[in-house]
Amino acid sequence: IIDDHGTRLPLGAEGEIAVRAPDPVMFLRYWNKPDDTARKFRGEWLVTGDRGVMDPEGYVTFVGRDDDVITSAGYRIGPGEVEDCLLRHPAVAAAAVIGLPDLLRTERVTAVIVPKPGVAPSPALARDIGDHVRTRLAAHLYPRQVEFTDALPQTATGKIMRRALRARYTQ
């Protein structure tokens, strides 16, 4: 687990998951794309684009994709923990968490919710969903904004297309 400068981080610290080069089974380069190859390396480390934490036994816990990480009020927030909490709310069928531009916080934690059948979106429900997270997770994790949608955009493999959601709510 390394920081933005390629320095190993202490156990328990969140950073980017990286693999020390060279390794016999590791990717060597992008064909005819030296600039793209250079961006994948930070010193002796091949960076994966994934965030994680290493425990004292050497196990790495995946936190999220680096491009999914939300930076809000100085905190780096992986959407997974917030989404898991949102899915435990009785009115939520599906949820995605994204960061939207915010002048004060850099990014505003935003929950995009697909309500369960028969549940009508409302400002009161949005407040209740926000309070649900606020009482279960750290204060900086709760969504300052809750949006409702009929469906979340997904790839063919079922992954949430966060870039499409960010584009939808920043226009």
Which ranges hold each PLM region?
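Adenylate-forming AMP-binding core of the ANL superfamily, especially NRPS adenylation
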Residues: 1-32, 40
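Hydrophobic alpha-helical segments, especially N-terminal targeting/anchoring helices
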Residues: 2-3, 11, 48, 54, ...
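AMP-binding/adenylate-forming catalytic core of the ANL superfamily
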Residues: 21-23, 28-29, 36, 51-141, ...
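FAD-site-proximal beta/loop scaffold in flavoenzymes
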Residues: 44
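General small-molecule cofactor/ligand-binding pocket signal
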Residues: 146-149
